[in-house]
């Protein structure tokens, strides 16, 4: 399921030729994503290593993890919401086993600054962290 969702976004982004238009698409994705409750914008859910405050919250439902995400910067919000959508509804095991290098196919290194690219890697690490903690049910 993770790979299928990611491939859907890759197809959309690969059909956009202009890098600036890709940038706008990612920001629009964030703008159109559901806002996160202010009560969840706490240090526990903050993604370290992002240039802007960014939050990623896991919700454990039966054997699946669903994510809510937000950021104060539109490009970060777009990326974290896209990542949240790709992984939401997956089992912790599927998340742990998925090769996050698949995200490299988005070629974000040509689109984002090095600092923003580091932020994306931090978002992906946070997802893996939650998948490893799944048995402890650390979140809401």
Spans of model-derived segments:
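Conserved interaction-surface patches within small, structured recognition/assembly domains
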Residues: 59-75, 84-88
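Amphipathic alpha-helical interface surfaces
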Residues: 75-79, 91, 99, 123
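Short acidic alpha-helix initiation/capping motifs at coil-to-helix transition points
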Residues: 1-5, 74-78
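N-terminal intrinsically disordered, cationic/polar leader segments
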Residues: 2-53, 60-65, 106-140
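Short, hydrophobic/amphipathic alpha-helical patches that form generic packing surfaces
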Residues: 28, 81-85
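A general alpha-helix detector
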Residues: 8-9, 79-82
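Solvent-exposed interaction patches of small proteins and small membrane subunits
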Residues: 44-51, 71, 93-98
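Glycine-rich phosphate/pyrophosphate-binding loops
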Residues: 89-106
């Amino acid at each position: 399921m993770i790979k299928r969702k990611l491939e859907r976004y890759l197809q959309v982004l690969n059909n956009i030729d202009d890098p600036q238009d890709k940038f706008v698409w990612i920001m629009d994705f964030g703008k159109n994503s559901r806002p996160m409750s202010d009560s969840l914008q706490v240090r526990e859910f903050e993604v370290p290593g992002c240039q802007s405050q960014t939050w990623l919250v896991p919700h454990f439902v039966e054997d699946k993890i669903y994510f809510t995400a937000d950021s104060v910067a539109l490009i970060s919000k777009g990326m974290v919401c896209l990542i949240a959508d790709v992984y939401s509804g997956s089992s912790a095991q599927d998340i742990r086993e998925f090769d996050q290098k698949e995200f490299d196919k988005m070629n974000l290194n040509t689109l984002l600054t090095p600092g923003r690219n580091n932020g994306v890697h931090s978002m992906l690490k946070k997802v893996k962290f939650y998948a490893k903690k799944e048995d402890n049910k650390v979140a809401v």
